[in-house]
From Swiss-Prot:
Catalytic activity, reaction form: adenosine(37) in tRNA + dimethylallyl diphosphate = N(6)-dimethylallyladenosine(37) in tRNA + diphosphate
Any one GO MF annotation of this record: ATP binding
Protein name: tRNA dimethylallyltransferase
Site location (Interaction with substrate tRNA): 99, 121
Database matches in NCBIfam families: miaA (TIGR00174)
Function recorded in the entry: Catalyzes the transfer of a dimethylallyl group onto the adenine at position 37 in tRNAs that read codons beginning with uridine, leading to the formation of N6-(dimethylallyl)adenosine (i(6)A).
Organism expressing this protein natively: Wolbachia sp. subsp. Brugia malayi (strain TRS)
List of residues binding ATP: 10-17
Primary enzyme class: transferase
Underlying gene: miaA
Length: 297
């Protein structure tokens, strides 16, 4: 267990990366530990907006091959190692990122769900792809009645996870979630960055254009040439599916940009709702760099 852990989270394009750069300038002896489920993949630094390679300050960024199915359980193991390493070297760890499941598992502890086999994941992915939303929901409901009223028809990610778990273990994911381990840390301080929506949406639009100009298309082309399974997390990073459609000649680049921007804005909208409801004890900040004025340690 560790005390006084700082967590900086918030929606996508809220200014977390710029804030971290400024915190490094202010404090120096800190380690920024990644808490973004897509920024761990080393083949997609542009499309996931990873910070520059500065291993002295930034940890768990671009460290996992895209062919891997990195999980929250593996992240918690790696996180503990990075926090221990930072404290042993007189550096203060700051955990930052916008992956809600990662943050939630860190604070509330993780359910001890056994690992799901790659074969089951592929089978569920195929079912999700070949069935309509309504058909997929009915299928999952027929296997796990506990999802009723807890997972919506549109939440395909959570539906897929529920089907994977009950197929692999014979028990509902909600049964597993009732049995939790001890949290990793005793005390933590959470800062949640939630700027004005119009500012975030504008940043999302401009950031994706910058990604394209910085080589995101070539980056995704190399990823596509790896012939990875479409259900892998790296293949589902924001912007990747849209660029793949462009590379396959299904849509124009302009359409890919527009669709990716729209999908990311919709994701940000869902994040707003999620973060407002999940962490009642966090300190909400409407501008990331306001945190520079605080003494967070």
């Amino acid at each position: 267990m560790r005390d006084n852990i700082i967590i900086i989270t918030g929606i996508t394009a809220s200014g977390k990366s710029e804030l971290c750069d400024n915190l490094i300038k202010k404090y120096g002896n800190i380690s920024i530990v990644n808490c973004d489920s897509k920024q761990v993949y080393k083949e997609i630094p542009i499309i996931t907006a990873q910070p520059p390679k500065q291993e002295e300050f930034y940890r768990l960024y671009g460290c996992v091959p895209a062919k891997e199915n990195y999980s929250v359980g593996l992240w918690l193991e790696d996180l503990k190692g990075e926090v221990d390493h930072a404290l042993e070297n007189a550096r203060m760890p700051i955990i930052t990122g916008g992956s809600g499941l990662y943050i939630s598992s860190l604070i509330n502890s993780l359910s001890p769900i056994p690992k799901v086999s790659e074969e089951i994941r592929k089978n569920v992915s195929e079912l999700r792809k070949n069935l309509s939303k309504e058909e997929f929901y009915k299928l999952v409901l027929s296997k796990d009645s506990k999802i009723q009223g807890k997972i919506s028809t549109n939440d395909l990610h959570r539906l897929s996870r529920a089907l994977e778990v009950i197929t692999a273990t014979g028990k509902s994911i909600f049964v597993w979630q009732e049995s939790r381990q001890l949290p990793l840390f005793d005390n933590f301080k959470i800062y949640t960055i939630l700027p004005k929506r119009e500012d975030v949406y504008r940043k999302i639009n401009s950031r994706f254009v910058t990604m394209i100009e910085s080589g995101a298309v070539d980056e995704v082309k190399k990823l596509l040439n790896m012939n990875l399974a479409p259900h892998l997390p790296a293949m589902r990073a924001h912007g990747v599916p849209e660029i793949i459609k462009y590379l396959k000649g299904k849509i124009t680049l302009s359409e890919a940009i527009q669709i990716a921007q729209t999908n990311t804005r919709h994701y940000a909208k869902r994040q707003y709702t999620w973060f407002k409801n999940q962490f009642p004890n966090s300190e909400v900040i409407d501008c990331a760099n306001k945190l520079i004025e605080f003494e967070i340690f």
